[in-house]
């Protein structure tokens, strides 16, 4: 498989496309969060599979991880990472819970985290499909009961040449004027990256031809 080469301009374009999608996701999340929500993509990087596994494994002991796979024309996944503090605050705001016990998660709380992941991933995927004219969808989110590395290996085994393009998404959640950040990881495999680059490059060529013909 060819090694993808991404220029700085193309990185910026991909980040901007994702930011447009995340803006819609933030609006959807704000409805249940009952406050302002800001989502943005602060970083984009190509990383090796082993590094991806290490990256998500370090969160396992301190965060509840919700996974949603992206399927169709693109192949990837989103991981939302919730700490005990995040879960406590979201439970109070969205479920009107009082005296939330940290470290113990009820069925209702898990359903809330799944719904938040579903809203954000669903809105993001819909916008990406519209912008990139592609047929993609998000699978129902799940909270892996085994190690997240094992859950991700299911994807990696199916795609042995998987060299993920990883986006770290900063979810900034404002509650009572206090800003809380929820980490979210979004990654695509190499094939998907090549498809996205091809769409961007084709659009750039078409735009250039239109300008020259005017």
Regions found by a protein language model. Give the residues of each.
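Composition-driven recognition of glycine/serine/threonine/acidic- and proline-rich low-complexity segments
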Residues: 2-26, 30-214
């Amino acid at each position: 498989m060819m090694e993808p080469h991404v220029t700085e301009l193309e990185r910026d374009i991909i980040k901007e496309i994702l930011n447009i999608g995340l803006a819609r996701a933030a609006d959807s999340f704000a409805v249940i969060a009952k406050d302002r929500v800001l989502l943005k993509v602060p970083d984009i990087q190509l990383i090796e599979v082993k590094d991806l596994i290490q990256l998500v494994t370090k969160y396992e002991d301190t965060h509840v991880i919700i996974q949603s796979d992206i399927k169709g024309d693109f192949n990837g996944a989103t991981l939302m990472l919730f700490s005990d503090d995040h879960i406590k605050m979201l439970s109070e705001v969205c479920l009107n819970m009082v005296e939330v016990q940290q470290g113990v998660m009820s069925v209702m709380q898990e359903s809330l985290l799944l719904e938040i992941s579903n809203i954000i991933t669903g809105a993001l995927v819909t916008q990406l499909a519209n912008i990139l004219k592609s047929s993609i969808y998000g699978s129902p989110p799940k909270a892996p009961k085994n190690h997240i590395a094992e859950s991700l290996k299911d994807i990696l085994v199916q795609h042995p040449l998987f060299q993920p393009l990883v986006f770290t998404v900063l979810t900034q959640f404002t509650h009572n004027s206090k800003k809380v950040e929820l980490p979210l990881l979004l990654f695509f495999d190499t094939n998907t990256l090549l498809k996205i680059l091809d769409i961007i490059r084709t659009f750039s060529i078409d735009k250039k031809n239109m300008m020259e013909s005017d």
